[in-house]
């Protein structure tokens, strides 16, 4: 596989296609809009929802009152001018990430089922829940397993948003995921061989990806999603 060099691939495209895949698994179709390359720091373009028979998600965010009143819209990073052209994402990267996400979901099927039932999303709580989980997920460092968990958690939030007839939140979640990748994970990914290295390590052989303790993550998810009134630090300090 040709390596993308230091510039890397377009994180926005990776996020958009992953979310599209997770929603399609539940029978939803999401037009991710313009997935052309965007440099780290740039915000993704909003997507547009359509639905397969039997599902009635909201129309595009610009036409929905939830989107108009939501405080969650985040502008592009200041100074996010056009940077070096990013390389197109090879299909094998998307495929490997999907396979890893599905494997993660299967391993923790019960936890994700409980999480979905407890995910009390509103336009005013979604970003806080996302930020709390992601901050704790990477508190002790970054590895590929945690990056996959990051994508899968974002996918769960998107599916639950549509299930609760708040589909405009999907555009926001995609934006938050892309921004976090660009600002906090992009350097680690590039320093560790980029997405090509992820494919080489976990693609055909599917080397075990989830070889660290998930207790703190699962505890965190439970706390964040039921809106516990204690801080994570205080809780984890007594464990």
From Swiss-Prot:
Return the annotated region ranges for Disordered. 39-85
Species, as recorded: Homo sapiens
Q: How does it assemble?
A: Forms homodimers, and heterodimers with BAX, BAD, BAK and Bcl-X(L). Heterodimerization with BAX requires intact BH1 and BH2 motifs, and is necessary for anti-apoptotic activity. Part of a complex composed of SEPTIN4 isoform ARTS, XIAP and BCL2, within the complex interacts (via BH3 domain) with SEPTIN4 isoform ARTS and XIAP, SEPTIN4 isoform ARTS acts as a scaffold protein and stabilizes the complex. Component of the complex, at least composed of LRPPRC, BECN1 and BCL2; the interactions prevent BECN1 from forming an autophagy-inducing complex with PIK3C3. Interacts with EI24. (Microbial infection) Interacts with Toxoplasma gondii ROP17; the interaction probably promotes BCL2 phosphorylation and degradation.
Q: Got a GO cellular component term for this one? A: cytoplasm
Q: Where is this motif: BH4?
A: 10-30
Q: Where is the composition biased (Low complexity)?
A: 75-85
Query: Lineage of this protein's species?
Result: Eukaryota, Metazoa, Chordata, Craniata, Vertebrata
Q: Which GO terms describe its molecular function?
A: BH3 domain binding; channel activity; channel inhibitor activity; DNA-binding transcription factor binding; identical protein binding; molecular adaptor activity; protease binding; protein heterodimerization activity
Q: Supply the PANTHER family for this chain.
A: APOPTOSIS REGULATOR BCL-2, BCL-2 RELATED
Q: Where in the cell is it found?
A: Mitochondrion outer membrane; Nucleus membrane; Endoplasmic reticulum membrane; Cytoplasm
SUPFAM superfamilies named among the record's database cross-references: Bcl-2 inhibitors of programmed cell death
Region Required for interaction with SEPTIN4 isoform ARTS. Required XIAP-mediated ubiquitination and apoptosis, as annotated, extends over 92-107
Explain the purpose of this protein. Answer: Suppresses apoptosis in a variety of cell systems including factor-dependent lymphohematopoietic and neural cells. Regulates cell death by controlling the mitochondrial membrane permeability. Appears to function in a feedback loop system with caspases. Inhibits caspase activity either by preventing the release of cytochrome c from the mitochondria and/or by binding to the apoptosis-activating factor (APAF-1). Also acts as an inhibitor of autophagy: interacts with BECN1 and AMBRA1 during non-starvation conditions and inhibits their autophagy function.
Q: What kind of modification does the protein receive after translation?
A: Phosphorylation/dephosphorylation on Ser-70 regulates anti-apoptotic activity. Growth factor-stimulated phosphorylation on Ser-70 by PKC is required for the anti-apoptosis activity and occurs during the G2/M phase of the cell cycle. In the absence of growth factors, BCL2 appears to be phosphorylated by other protein kinases such as ERKs and stress-activated kinases. Phosphorylated by MAPK8/JNK1 at Thr-69, Ser-70 and Ser-87, which stimulates starvation-induced autophagy. Dephosphorylated by protein phosphatase 2A (PP2A).
Q: What is the effect of changing residue 190 to L?
A: Partial loss of BAX-binding and 50% decrease in anti-apoptotic activity. No effect on homodimerization
Annotated site location: Cleavage = 34-35
Indicate which residues form the motif BH1.
136-155
Q: Which disease is it linked to?
A: A chromosomal aberration involving BCL2 has been found in chronic lymphatic leukemia. Translocation t(14;18)(q32;q21) with immunoglobulin gene regions. BCL2 mutations found in non-Hodgkin lymphomas carrying the chromosomal translocation could be attributed to the Ig somatic hypermutation mechanism resulting in nucleotide transitions.
Q: For the modification Phosphoserine, which residues carry it?
A: 70, 87
The entry's stated outcome for residue 144 to A is: Loss of BAX-binding and of anti-apoptotic activity
Please describe, based on the UniProt annotation, the reported consequence of changing residue 59 to S: In non-Hodgkin lymphoma; somatic mutation
Disulfides per UniProt: none
Q: How does it sit in the membrane?
A: Single-pass membrane protein
Q: Which GO terms describe its biological process?
A: actin filament organization; apoptotic process; autophagy; axon regeneration; axonogenesis; B cell apoptotic process; B cell homeostasis; B cell lineage commitment
Q: What is the tissue localization of expression for this protein?
A: Expressed in a variety of tissues.
**Which residues are in coiled coils?**
none
Q: What is this protein called?
A: Apoptosis regulator Bcl-2
């Amino acid at each position: 596989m040709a390596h993308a060099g230091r510039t890397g691939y377009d994180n926005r495209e990776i996020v958009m296609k992953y979310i599209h895949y997770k929603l399609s698994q539940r029978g939803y179709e999401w037009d991710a809009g313009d997935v052309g390359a965007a440099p780290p720091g740039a915000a993704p373009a909003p997507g547009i929802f359509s639905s397969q028979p039997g599902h009635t998600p909201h129309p595009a965010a610009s036409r929905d009152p939830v989107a108009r009143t939501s405080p969650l819209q985040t502008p592009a990073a200041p100074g996010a001018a056009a940077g070096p052209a990013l390389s197109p994402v090879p299909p094998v990267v998307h495929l490997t990430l999907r396979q890893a996400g599905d494997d993660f979901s299967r391993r923790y099927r019960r936890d994700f089922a409980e999480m979905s039932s407890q995910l009390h999303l509103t336009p005013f709580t979604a970003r806080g829940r996302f930020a709390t989980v992601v901050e704790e997920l990477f508190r002790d460092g970054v590895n590929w397993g945690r990056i996959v968990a990051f994508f899968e958690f974002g996918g769960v939030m998107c599916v639950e948003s549509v299930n609760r007839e708040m589909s405009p939140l999907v555009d926001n979640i995609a934006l938050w995921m892309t921004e976090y990748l660009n600002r906090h994970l992009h350097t680690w990914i590039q320093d560790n061989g980029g997405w090509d290295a992820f494919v080489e390590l976990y693609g055909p052989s599917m080397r075990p990806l989830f070889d660290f303790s998930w207790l703190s993550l699962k505890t965190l998810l439970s706390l964040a999603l039921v809106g516990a009134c204690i801080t994570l630090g205080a809780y984890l300090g007594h464990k």
